[in-house]
Amino acid sequence: MTRRTISQAIEYFRNFGWIAKVTVIGCDEQISEATAARAALAALNCLHVLIGAGHSTKMQVGGPGLANDRRAGFTVKADGALSYMVSYGGQGNVGFDDNWMDLFSGADAQEIIANLGIALEQAVNPALHRPLSERLLDAMQWYGEAVREPSQGAKAVKYVTALERMVMTDEKDDIASLVSSRVAALCLEEPTVHCRDRWQVDVRRAYDIRSRLVHGSVSPTSEIVFEGVRLGSQLARSTLLNAVRLIGAKGLRDEAATNRDLARWFDGMVRHVDEVILQSIPRASTMPFA
């Protein structure tokens, strides 16, 4: 019976392309199992951010061990005619280019992956207290839940919540302005007013759609919600990837970092970006009056 059970377990795992091996430090069996499950999910959330929502919506931890996803449907039309369909699909995501792994070969990508590994140390060792790693993994969780979420309305809400968890530090007033300025400072590609303002406008738009959704002024099936999902996904992913790189290994390992420290860091970054933009603006030449 034991051999048969082991054989069935092995057959189950053969249905999956990736297997997580998690080592939990200093815990009993029950806590270790729960911690390992959370850590595997945290790693999946990181993969969602690395790969992007478009190629990772079907990724999950565990689930049914199905070799393929077979579905069928019948429809009777008004004239009595019968139409039908059968579809076959794999359990994982498809559509990657052959060289998709090359996206992660650059220096910035390698730094991000290494820093995500540092953040995940918090997930497998409950004794660690690293506030910035915890904050990052929380934000990644909101992003991952948004990717896997079937409801478009819930997706829009969760993507913006990922933004908030990453850049909010207990502030209570003018939240949309604060989030938009910090996201723009993190994600700015070039030091121009246009680029900064574009990021801020996009964040405010995603924030407005989220607010209208949660306060009931728009339907979760409204067309505007799809705009919220698109913006939220792009903004959250860019913010998280840049935060991982800029916080760095030292920040992710810091056990004494506080919300106040992070707020000062964000505010300093916003001021620095504004100063760089100001310095890059050509000054108008002036002539003395005759």
Question: Where are the regions that the model predicts?
Answer:
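Charged/polar positions within long, soluble alpha-helices
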Residues: 171, 208-219, 241-249
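Charged, non-catalytic interaction/linker regions at domain boundaries
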Residues: 1-154, 161, 227-229, 238-290
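Residue-level detector of well-ordered alpha-helical segments, enriched
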Residues: 138, 155-159, 175, 179, ...
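Flexible secondary-structure boundary motifs
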Residues: 161-197
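Residue-level recognition of alpha-helical structural elements
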Residues: 135, 151-155, 172, 195, ...
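Short acidic (Asp/Glu) and glycine-rich catalytic loops that position anionic groups and cofactors
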Residues: 138, 159, 184-187, 212-216
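Charged, amphipathic alpha-helical oligomerization/scaffolding segments
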Residues: 138, 145, 202-205, 209-212, ...
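Histidine-centered, metal-coordinating catalytic motifs and their short helical/loop contexts
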Residues: 196-224
